[in-house]
Structures are given as C-alpha cells and as structure tokens.
Amino acid sequence: MAEISDLDRQIEQLRRCELIKESEVKALCAKAREILVEESNVQRVDSPVTVCGDIHGQFYDLKELFRVGGDVPETNYLFMGDFVDRGFYSVETFLLLLALKVRYPDRITLIRGNHESRQITQVYGFYDECLRKYGSVTVWRYCTEIFDYLSLSAIIDGKIFCVHGGLSPSIQTLDQIRTIDRKQEVPHDGPMCDLLWSDPEDTTGWGVSPRGAGYLFGSDVVAQFNAANDIDMICRAHQLVMEGYKWHFNETVLTVWSAPNYCYRCGNVAAILELDEHLQKDFIIFEAAPQETRGIPSKKPVADYFL
C-alpha cells in the first residue's frame, strides 16, 4: 500500500496549497488516465451527491467549499468542469481534485468544462501558471492530456442530467452523447463543443451564442430533450450567477456557480447543490474564504523578477 500512502501524502501537501513534484504529477496523471478511460461520456452517478459548478483556480474557495459541504470521501461530489484558469491557483486546484479522484474514484466525479482545453488555457492563465510554478510546460502537457479523458456529462439516478454548458442541436438523446469520441481537444463546433459551451436563453428554439461557440437554447428545446430522455432536469454551470444558483424554464434547468467573488472582484456568492437519496434539493450558499486564510499573491509573483 506504499502507493496509497504516497498519494495520501500528496493530497495533504496539495491541501496545504503546496506543489507536488513534476515526477509525481506525471505518475498521478498516469493513474488518473487509467480510471477516467473507463468512464462513460454520460457517467452514471448515484445519489446522495453534492453537485458543484465552476471553481476556476480559486483554491482557498475550494477549501471553503469542502468546509461547508464536507470532505471527500465522506461526501460524494460531482464537479461540472472549469477547474482551471483565471484564479491564482489552477495548478493546486486541479491536482488536488485529480488526486482525490485517484484516491477515491467512486466518491468524486469530474466532468469537462470549456476551460479544460489546450487552446483556452493558453489564453486564460493555466499555461502561464504551470510555466511559472514548474519552470517548464511539462506539467501543463500532463494535465491537458488528462482533460481529454474527462467525461462530457453525468446522469444522477437516471433523472438529473449534468453537463458543463448545455444542449446541442446535434443531440436529441443521451445515447448520441455516448457515441462521441471524447478523447480529443475540445473542437470549435459540433456536439462535443456545444455540450461545453451552450447557454439557456429566454427564447424558443436555438440562437447564436455571443460566446462564439455553442448555442443559446430555449425552453421548448429543454422540454423535448427532458421528455425524450425521461429526465427531470438539467444541471449545468458555465455562467456566473450572483446568487450562486439560478433556475430557468420552470425549474427544468439549473445553473450552479461555485466560485465566490469570482476573479477576486465580482462580489458574488457561490452555491453547491446537495441531493439526498430521494433527489430532494438543498442549496448551500457560501462566500469567499476569509482574506487571512489565503495568501493572495500580487498579480506578478516575486519570482518573475529573478527568473
């Protein structure tokens, strides 16, 4: 059991927001790949479970989330993507979640967000952070390879469909999602792209997305999809909501946002959704971790001046 104790040590280190060695990242990603490759594009998840939205590298707020929601493995978690970018601690955030996944594979489910992509992370911070913290892009490469193995969606008790963004005009059934070859960079268009990029909109049918990827989808589209797949609701993340969660279309779509005071300046609260074994819902609202518990670095860490 040397591997488990190694992993437990790494988890403790990461919980303290301390980096693990590049060689340890390589080994962790290799183990994660073995687990993730077995998961479905529509990963089955059993209740009770706590569902979480975007985290975006806000490590101390992820610790706050675990403080209010309970730790892994006591609490069963589903994270709906966007672990990295924009926050100061994308590396520690993603590696902690990945280490927990390897240690407790049945107690934490990670699905892919639009930021789990090589192209997006080169623009929004994760690439630069890996380079700064490890002195090379190797760790970024290991992590982005793992992104390709993450599930595209999850289904809780066959009734609640969870996806990062939303629906696609190319997809009417969950079986169609199951046939996608997900082990690739997020494409610029098509069903896999849409699942990670789309947003609900107070309209009917499909609309052009201002994001430049995915679509806007209306209440009629949701009603058809939910009926065709015998599901009660769609749970998704992807959009900042100031109250932490927001219902759409007569409670058939739910947005959950789990990064409080987003980008350290938006002033929003965050939420997680607790589902019991009967799928009864309980929202936990939380605020950003108190200032004194987080060493927020200056925008440009000191190391840069000496490199």
Curated annotation (Swiss-Prot):
<dbReference type="InterPro" id="IPR047129">
    <property type="entry name" value="PPA2-like"/>
</dbReference>
<keyword id="KW-0206">Cytoskeleton</keyword>
<dbReference type="GO" id="GO:0046872">
    <property type="term" value="F:metal ion binding"/>
</dbReference>
<feature type="binding site">
    <location>
        <position position="82"/>
    </location>
    <ligand>
        <name>Mn(2+) 1</name>
    </ligand>
</feature>
<keyword id="KW-0007">Acetylation</keyword>
<dbReference type="GO" id="GO:0004722">
    <property type="term" value="F:protein serine/threonine phosphatase activity"/>
</dbReference>
<dbReference type="GO" id="GO:0005737">
    <property type="term" value="C:cytoplasm"/>
</dbReference>
<dbReference type="GO" id="GO:0005634">
    <property type="term" value="C:nucleus"/>
</dbReference>
<dbReference type="GO" id="GO:0005829">
    <property type="term" value="C:cytosol"/>
</dbReference>
<dbReference type="GO" id="GO:0005654">
    <property type="term" value="C:nucleoplasm"/>
</dbReference>
<dbReference type="GO" id="GO:0005886">
    <property type="term" value="C:plasma membrane"/>
</dbReference>
<feature type="modified residue" description="Leucine methyl ester">
    <location>
        <position position="307"/>
    </location>
</feature>
<feature type="binding site">
    <location>
        <position position="114"/>
    </location>
    <ligand>
        <name>Mn(2+) 2</name>
    </ligand>
</feature>
<feature type="modified residue" description="N-acetylalanine">
    <location>
        <position position="2"/>
    </location>
</feature>
<feature type="binding site">
    <location>
        <position position="238"/>
    </location>
    <ligand>
        <name>Mn(2+) 2</name>
    </ligand>
</feature>
<feature type="binding site">
    <location>
        <position position="56"/>
    </location>
    <ligand>
        <name>Mn(2+) 1</name>
    </ligand>
</feature>
<dbReference type="GO" id="GO:0000785">
    <property type="term" value="C:chromatin"/>
</dbReference>
<feature type="binding site">
    <location>
        <position position="54"/>
    </location>
    <ligand>
        <name>Mn(2+) 1</name>
    </ligand>
</feature>
<dbReference type="GO" id="GO:0010569">
    <property type="term" value="P:regulation of double-strand break repair via homologous recombination"/>
</dbReference>
<keyword id="KW-0479">Metal-binding</keyword>
<dbReference type="InterPro" id="IPR006186">
    <property type="entry name" value="Ser/Thr-sp_prot-phosphatase"/>
</dbReference>
<comment type="function">
    <text>Protein phosphatase that is involved in many processes such as microtubule organization at centrosomes, maturation of spliceosomal snRNPs, apoptosis, DNA repair, tumor necrosis factor (TNF)-alpha signaling, activation of c-Jun N-terminal kinase MAPK8, regulation of histone acetylation, DNA damage checkpoint signaling, NF-kappa-B activation and cell migration. The PPP4C-PPP4R1 PP4 complex may play a role in dephosphorylation and regulation of HDAC3.</text>
</comment>
<comment type="subunit">
    <text>Serine/threonine-protein phosphatase 4 (PP4) occurs in different assemblies of the catalytic and one or more regulatory subunits. Component of the PP4 complexes PPP4C-PPP4R1, PPP4C-PPP4R2, PPP4C-PPP4R2-PPP4R3A, PPP4C-PPP4R2-PPP4R3B and PPP4C-PPP4R4. The PPP4C-PPP4R2 complex appears to be a tetramer composed of 2 molecules of PPP4C and 2 molecules of PPP4R2. Interacts with REL, NFKB1/p50 and RELA. Interacts with SMN1 and GEMIN4. Interacts with IRS4 (phosphorylated). Interacts with SMEK1/PPP4R3A; the interaction requires PP4R2. Interacts with HDAC3.</text>
</comment>
<dbReference type="Pfam" id="PF00149">
    <property type="entry name" value="Metallophos"/>
</dbReference>
<feature type="binding site">
    <location>
        <position position="164"/>
    </location>
    <ligand>
        <name>Mn(2+) 2</name>
    </ligand>
</feature>
<protein>
    <recommendedName>
        <fullName>Serine/threonine-protein phosphatase 4 catalytic subunit</fullName>
        <ecNumber>3.1.3.16</ecNumber>
    </recommendedName>
</protein>
<dbReference type="InterPro" id="IPR029052">
    <property type="entry name" value="Metallo-depent_PP-like"/>
</dbReference>
<keyword id="KW-0488">Methylation</keyword>
<dbReference type="GO" id="GO:2000779">
    <property type="term" value="P:regulation of double-strand break repair"/>
</dbReference>
<dbReference type="GO" id="GO:0030289">
    <property type="term" value="C:protein phosphatase 4 complex"/>
</dbReference>
<keyword id="KW-0464">Manganese</keyword>
<comment type="similarity">
    <text>Belongs to the PPP phosphatase family. PP-4 (PP-X) subfamily.</text>
</comment>
<keyword id="KW-0539">Nucleus</keyword>
<keyword id="KW-0904">Protein phosphatase</keyword>
<feature type="binding site">
    <location>
        <position position="82"/>
    </location>
    <ligand>
        <name>Mn(2+) 2</name>
    </ligand>
</feature>
<keyword id="KW-0378">Hydrolase</keyword>
<dbReference type="InterPro" id="IPR004843">
    <property type="entry name" value="Calcineurin-like_PHP_ApaH"/>
</dbReference>
<dbReference type="GO" id="GO:0005813">
    <property type="term" value="C:centrosome"/>
</dbReference>
<dbReference type="GO" id="GO:0000724">
    <property type="term" value="P:double-strand break repair via homologous recombination"/>
</dbReference>
<keyword id="KW-0963">Cytoplasm</keyword>
<feature type="active site" description="Proton donor">
    <location>
        <position position="115"/>
    </location>
</feature>
